[in-house]
């Protein structure tokens, strides 16, 4: 069986909203082991929806629609599908009853326009919506074609998918084998370099190993097709362990682990604490750290020293060094890191100062130049220079700077685990 995702909505075509439904469904189909080769976005236009249907029914057997199930005139998905298959719409009283109850729970009366949502093709099964008023359908209008419709609201779509669609597909025998995946994450190595190191694994068929990169992070997805998670892990884990050995310290986490969560785990294990001093990243590093539940146990806080006087007043950065070297320099990065350690009384301090652009660069200090400082309570202070000039985008430079700073600390913490610890008294 081949599935196809069709997302209906002019707002998607215009880029007004992100098409997160397609991403979710694509991952779900892969996990279920259902082949999926095509995705289409089409506006709220009956003729164009029919054109998409004509193409999709010729190449796929499971057509998954999202969007266009609401009560407004431009919500045309179900009516257009029914018209395409020359099938009448029937008002279903159980849908009317469900919508009426949902309105009553909010102290309201169902509007006349909502009756439209109770119209579904004759012979179609109702796909209940436990959250909203728009039900979906599961329908086999002709042999070898199954239509599923979901609302465009992601929370509603996901709930209906999990509670009804997956059990239905499993009951049809479409998911005899499932694809199980684990994603290994790396920082400090390029996608091409990692691919070269693990080249023999990229040729495997079960499990498959696929590299991809985003915002400087490289990932390897190891996927195995099997009838159970236990059998899949027997295929995946040996490959995973070999790749981790090859990558060494460039490997940092699995699946949902982030650099911030890994750093937090290492700090908890060592009983150490952290503070940050930020300039060009404007608090992004602190935000990343505090996004981890329980981070107050090791993260004390930070200073956003965007203006030079703040660097001097709050972080004890030397005015003469600022005048001589500039705020974007090794010496200032070091003083920011050591300053925040002393001010907040932590074991570790990280600083970031740089030129995120789009303006402010020069021949000697171009946009993308970033210095990251790392200080320890025992006065060991280092700084590292990075040139992210190839990114040429302010948000990218800031984001990569934060991740690079976290990775630097991760490596320091990992190496310090290998030798005896001497904590601050």
Curated annotation (Swiss-Prot):
- A Pfam family: MoCF_biosynth
Task: State the InterPro entries in the record.
Answer: CinA (IPR050101), CinA-like_C (IPR036653), CinA_C (IPR008136), CinA_KH (IPR041424), Competence-induced_CinA (IPR008135), MoaB/Mog-like_dom_sf (IPR036425), MoaB/Mog_dom (IPR001453)
Family label:
Belongs to the CinA family.
Q: What is this protein called?
A: CinA-like protein
Instruction: Tell me which SUPFAM superfamilies the record gives.
Output: CinA-like, Molybdenum cofactor biosynthesis proteins
NCBIfam families of this UniProt entry?
Answer: cinA_nterm, molyb_syn, PncC_domain, PRK00549.1
């Amino acid at each position: 069986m081949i599935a196809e995702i069709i997302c209906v909505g002019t707002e998607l075509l215009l880029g007004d909203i992100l098409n997160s439904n397609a991403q979710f469904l694509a991952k779900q189909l892969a996990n279920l082991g259902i082949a999926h080769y095509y995705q289409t976005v089409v506006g709220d236009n009956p003729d164009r929806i029919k054109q998409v249907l004509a193409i999709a029914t010729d190449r796929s057997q499971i057509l998954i629609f999202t969007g266009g199930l609401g009560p407004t005139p431009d919500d045309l998905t179900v009516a257009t599908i029914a018209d395409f298959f020359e099938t009448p719409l029937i008002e279903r009283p159980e849908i009317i009853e469900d919508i009426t109850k949902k309105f009553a729970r909010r102290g309201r009366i169902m509007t006349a326009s909502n009756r439209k949502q109770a119209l579904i093709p004759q012979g179609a099964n109702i796909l209940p919506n436990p959250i909203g008023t728009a039900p979906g359908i599961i329908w086999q209008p002709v042999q070898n074609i199954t239509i599923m419709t979901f609302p465009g609201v992601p929370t509603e779509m996901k709930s209906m998918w999990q509670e009804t669609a997956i059990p239905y597909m499993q009951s049809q025998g479409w998911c005899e084998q499932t694809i199980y995946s684990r994603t290994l994450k790396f920082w400090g190595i390029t996608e091409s370099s990692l691919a070269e190191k693990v080249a023999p694994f990229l040729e495997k068929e079960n499990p498959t190993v696929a590299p991809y990169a985003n915002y400087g992070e490289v990932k390897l997805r190891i996927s195995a097709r099997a009838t159970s998670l236990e059998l899949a892990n027997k295929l995946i884990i040996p490959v995973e362990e070999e790749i981790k050995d090859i990558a060494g310290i460039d490997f940092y986490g699995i699946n949902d682990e982030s650099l911030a969560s890994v750093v937090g785990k290492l700090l908890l294990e060592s009983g150490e604490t952290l503070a940050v001093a930020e300039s060009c990243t404007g608090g992004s590093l602190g935000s990343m750290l505090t996004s981890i539940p329980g981070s107050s146990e090791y993260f004390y806080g930070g200073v956003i020293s965007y203006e030079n006087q703040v660097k001097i007043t709050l972080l004890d950065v030397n005015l003469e060094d600022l005048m001589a070297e500039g705020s974007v320099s090794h010496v200032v990065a070091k003083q920011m890191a050591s300053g925040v350690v002393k001010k907040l009384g932590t074991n570790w301090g990280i600083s970031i100062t740089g030129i995120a652009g789009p303006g402010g660069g020069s021949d000697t200090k171009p946009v993308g130049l970033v210095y990251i400082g790392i200080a320890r309570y025992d006065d060991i202070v280092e700084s590292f220079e990075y040139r992210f000039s190839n990114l040429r985008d302010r948000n990218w430079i800031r984001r990569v700077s934060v991740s690079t700073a976290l990775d630097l600390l991760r490596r320091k913490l990992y190496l310090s685990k290998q030798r005896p610890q001497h904590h601050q008294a």
